[in-house]
């Protein structure tokens, strides 16, 4: 099968979040299964700085962005049997960052037009065209309303993945003519209109053959007013083509048996190295060395979305318990201040590291006993999967991808891979922590069984890849 991904970012070239991870991993997994896979993304200045000497200049052409006749440079690099095509235009993409400019609408309108015209130029007409988030959300619409006259494009099937429904691409309706060069009929009849704006994401939901998001529970949640960010009605209307597929993690890179960031390696059948990592981390961060004290790890952005309001509300209570806690991350200033204050008040119990350090993050996953992640909402989440891979049991709010990946401890049969609570409040977070501490302190065999079960879970991209492959095959 010929599959083309079009996205605004992709690891290792340019990455700001989970979308970059997906574009770095999913095409590679599909290629391993024998599919012909290409990725199209912008050629940012940071790509040129890091990879410019490896990338081949292929061709150039011009595209019309409304009245603007714009240069489209095409560069190419093959990596892991995936061919990356980069759209080069220094005016649009040499900004020192990926997103956040006043003219993002024009930048990504240009990118989508260039990507669609590129297919014919490189003679790669995909069976499936997979686009991601609002930056590429107009492609299914353009394919059917602007480029339908190109016969070779008529059999292309489209998949749109929502990584973050919050950013929908809402712009003035004049953009249809001014940038995309199409009439306003689909805006006037309401198809593309939302809150008196042109809404790119709404266009993708209506025009794509399939819509996916990054976990089954989140796919259900975005059909509700609480999580749908205004598009819940459209999601319910198009529910028949909506599904959720959990993202994977790189299980080769994230491996406690080989991780180069760890002082000691370990496996699910021999956890001695995990205990040594705990003692090493305690020493490194100035906490009393004690292999028996339950160590709680947090690696996160410090925001309300990640549940730090309820953590902060119970932090004093938590630190009254016989625990140690290590926090790593940056975010809202008041949360940074709160954790710094409590670290000075409880220096033998709390280490607050208000920074981001990849090496320390890996060491926290490996050393901690409990990984706290009570997000208010979480489309997928990777940290809980990484924690389980390293034998740290997640304590999560049952929402989105957390609900789909963490199996709550069952005290009757010992099943589970972590601990969870349903009602989003500090009280239930605290009650669930007390349960986890009781199991850790009083039932060590049950705890070891939970660790074994967590470390046995397969969250690799190979598993996620099978689900995408089945989805693509349904479209043929």
From Swiss-Prot:
Keywords for the protein's UniProt record, in alphabetical order: Glycogen biosynthesis, Glycosyltransferase, Transferase
Molecular-function GO terms, alphabetical: alpha-1,4-glucan glucosyltransferase (ADP-glucose donor) activity; alpha-1,4-glucan glucosyltransferase (UDP-glucose donor) activity
Pathway(s) this gene product operates in, as recorded in its UniProt entry: Glycan biosynthesis; glycogen biosynthesis
Catalytic activity: [(1->4)-alpha-D-glucosyl](n) + ADP-alpha-D-glucose = [(1->4)-alpha-D-glucosyl](n+1) + ADP + H(+)
CDD domains documented for this protein: GT5_Glycogen_synthase_DULL1-like
InterPro entries recorded: Glyco_trans_1 (IPR001296), GS/SS (IPR011835), Starch_synth_cat_dom (IPR013534)
EC number: 2.4.1.21
Positions that bind ADP-alpha-D-glucose: 15
A Gene Ontology biological process term: glycogen biosynthetic process
Gene3D superfamilies associated with the record: Glycogen Phosphorylase B
Disulfide bond entries: none
Keyword Metal-binding carried by entry: no
PANTHER family for the chain: ALPHA AMYLASE DOMAIN-CONTAINING PROTEIN, GRANULE-BOUND STARCH SYNTHASE 1, CHLOROPLASTIC/AMYLOPLASTIC
Protein role: Synthesizes alpha-1,4-glucan chains using ADP-glucose.
HAMAP family noted in UniProt: Glycogen_synth
Family per similarity comment: Belongs to the glycosyltransferase 1 family. Bacterial/plant glycogen synthase subfamily.
Name of protein: Glycogen synthase
Organism: Streptococcus agalactiae serotype III (strain NEM316)
